[in-house]
Amino acid sequence: MKLYFEAEVKSSLQEIKNLFNQELFLKLKPPFMSLELERFDGCEKGHEVHLKMGLPGFLQNWVSHITDSSQTDTAWEFVDEGKILPSPFTYWRHTHRTEKISETSCRISDSIEYGCQSLLLDKLLWGPLW
């Protein structure tokens, strides 16, 4: 399954890049889930993120590797791919991209590809992930 999100924000490219840290990661967790951040290296190629997440009392491991990252004067992006995923996920690839619109605004886009143990689960999770 594929998801795509896009938003315009009033911040510079560097300001947005600086905000991609542990604090932001924890703020973005869904309210109904528990999340423990065990390791956060950053957003550059070769970095890793290790999580324990799920419903309270039922945490599962999620390990993502940053498999690609690049920056130019007008764009910054990185890709995280799930290496250890909680059930029911079997595949996860998330491309984070920030493009400069002006000195004070950028477009942030997220392209997510994921797979589950069945097509039915893919479709059922599409709504909550969206």
Regions found by a protein language model. Name each.
Residues 81-130:
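Beta-strand/loop substructures that line and gate deep hydrophobic ligand-binding cavities in soluble
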Residues 8-12, 52-56, 67, 99-101, ...:
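Solvent-exposed residues in well-ordered beta-strands and their adjoining turns
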Residues 2-4, 59-65, 90-95:
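Short, surface-exposed coil-to-beta transition loops
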Residues 24-27, 36-86:
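Glycine-rich portal/gate segments that line the openings of hydrophobic small-molecule binding cavities
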Residues 15-17, 28, 59-61, 88-90, ...:
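Short acidic, gly/pro-rich beta-turn/loop elements at beta-sheet edges
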Residues 10-14, 42, 67-75, 97-107:
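A short, structured loop/turn motif at beta-sheet edges
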Residues 6-8, 20, 76-82, 108-113:
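A general secondary-structure boundary signal
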Residues 1-48:
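Hydrophobic ligand-binding cavity/cleft-lining segments
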